[in-house]
Amino acid sequence: MKILESSFKDGNKRIVEMESEDAYLMTMGKWVKKSMDPLRTKVFFSTMSPTHYKIEDWGGEQGKNFYNQTTPIQDMNHWPSDCSKTLMKVIGEELDQRADFLVTVLNITQLTSYRKDAHTSIYKKPWSPYDEGSASKSG
């Protein structure tokens, strides 16, 4: 990623190349330091929810949907196929190492991966009543 560290109007344009993750962490750090009092506030970093595209990740049949799921995943080692444990670990480690302030990571990715019974496509207001055939296959 190329970042312009000067004004467009400045004759001496300074362009820096860096990884997008580094740019994100740098920008977040600057904002937190400028906008928050670490003695009065806490910083939380929330990961993303899994995509929920593969019912097979929750023990369901391929091609089916989340309709009528009533129990969460009980296996604490469960991890969806489209989520990376390594990436979640790296996020926490990177934030710990790079930030000049305490950052608490809310691992929504892992937390929501257990909840096949709470898939939002089942609980939204439908145009017509849900049944096994009409519930969204992809969520």
UniProtKB/Swiss-Prot annotation:
Source organism per UniProt: Arabidopsis thaliana
Protein name: Putative truncated protein trichome birefringence-like 46
A Pfam family recorded for this sequence: PC-Esterase
Gene Ontology molecular function: any one: O-acetyltransferase activity
Family: Belongs to the PC-esterase family. TBL subfamily.
